[in-house]
């Protein structure tokens, strides 16, 4: 994993310079970096020092590449994965960076794909249903284990000393903004989509939180805050300390933080309802503007002003997309394929796409359920697992690859149909991210499966471009930026000339396969819990095995 920065001309949207910094610690999912303490299954942590390194290396790199005068830099925008949270002390220092807590896993950043709080999410949803909590429907009927409250419940239950020591539990996005400008201003995007906050009613009641765990009764006042700021606002000015580390001028405007998926919407020029954006990478987020709030089963959330001021913003998603393909390549692609790709001077992804693209639709006889990392929408269940149906002794890697690609496209089609059936129009489809940028084969499959033309982001770094747009908003017109999002998007948002159009004969064939996919989706997602029973047994046996190894 990495952090990325772009320097953008606010008048034209031209990306003048780009810099990338790989995270030193990457994703911590096996053992802690210093103590080497082993982590259980479904954990995904990060080290916050990596985030500061990104700022200290990428921003000076942008200035060096562009030869820009720091006086010309009018604003900074920050976006982040979410829900990605960390406990901090009263000085804003992450607890994992204090020696006494460095060996405690719960003191680290919990990445969005930390799924070890599924038990807590299940309990939260059960209690909320029993109490008829109104917020459930605005999250598609379920709160995901990826969101803030289940993760905080896990901390309170498994590491109460960490919960007690935390002066605040913050989204990483808000923490970075705090590091930049010294003000703790939480954004309405992560609060609304990930922390059960509403701009009219605030958070759920103290009584509800107490029913989850006694320690959580006063969580809003003790660990969170009701002081929430809208995306598009200015959080503050760059501190002298961070100015020294980045090479920028103290006082440079810093925007209220945002989420990587949501901030990409203006980057592709979307400023009105009816246009869905897919941000496609390891996972996929589906973003959509609306005129009013509609209850959509299995959506991740709907938040007023959550994406752009003046509109409600809808979010849905798939927990695993590109990670499927990475898994296949890591474990099941033969050496002969790797040598063939090397000989042709292309990546293994390109080779698999070429081979898969030469297959006829349905030729492999395979059908998959794209749940290798659970299901975010519309089933909202991290305990679901993947499935591949139809394999024979003749099945080849490219056939499995194509089946996985098609399954992710079917998952997106289910999301689109669910929104439409709930009264939320989707008339245009856009895509951004690494897959949209690099893989024509996958994008054509999506166009055929959804029967929609797909427009592609004009920037390979759509989240960073979107953040730059909000940085220009934070600066304001008096400082060379913009006062209104529509004006900023008109100058800075962009899409490519190339689009992917559905091929009629492919659409017809995929309709047949999609009907079969829906049968599997309903049966294994709602009717038969065999996946959960198998996962439970796996976890029990894994724990037993790990204990035996430790004793040995």
Swiss-Prot record:
An MF annotation (GO) of this entry: ATP binding
Any GO BP: L-arabinose catabolic process to xylulose 5-phosphate
Alphabetized HAMAP family for the sequence: Ribulokinase
One Gene Ontology term, aspect cellular component: cytoplasm
Gene3D superfamilies: 3.30.420.40
Family membership: Belongs to the ribulokinase family.
Superkingdom per UniProt: Bacteria
Enzyme class: transferase
Stored InterPro entries: ATPase_NBD, Carb_kinase_FGGY, Carb_kinase_FGGY_CS, FGGY_C, FGGY_N, Ribulokinase
Keyword Kinase (UniProt): yes
Keyword field: Arabinose catabolism, ATP-binding, Carbohydrate metabolism, Kinase, Nucleotide-binding, Transferase
Annotated catalysed reactions: D-ribulose + ATP = D-ribulose 5-phosphate + ADP + H(+); L-ribulose + ATP = L-ribulose 5-phosphate + ADP + H(+)
Organism of this sequence: Bacillus licheniformis (strain ATCC 14580 / DSM 13 / JCM 2505 / CCUG 7422 / NBRC 12200 / NCIMB 9375 / NCTC 10341 / NRRL NRS-1264 / Gibson 46)
Protein name: Ribulokinase
Enzyme nomenclature, EC number: 2.7.1.16
Pfam families: FGGY_C, FGGY_N
Entries under SUPFAM superfamilies matching the protein: Actin-like ATPase domain (SSF53067)
The protein's annotated pathway: Carbohydrate degradation; L-arabinose degradation via L-ribulose; D-xylulose 5-phosphate from L-arabinose (bacterial route): step 2/3
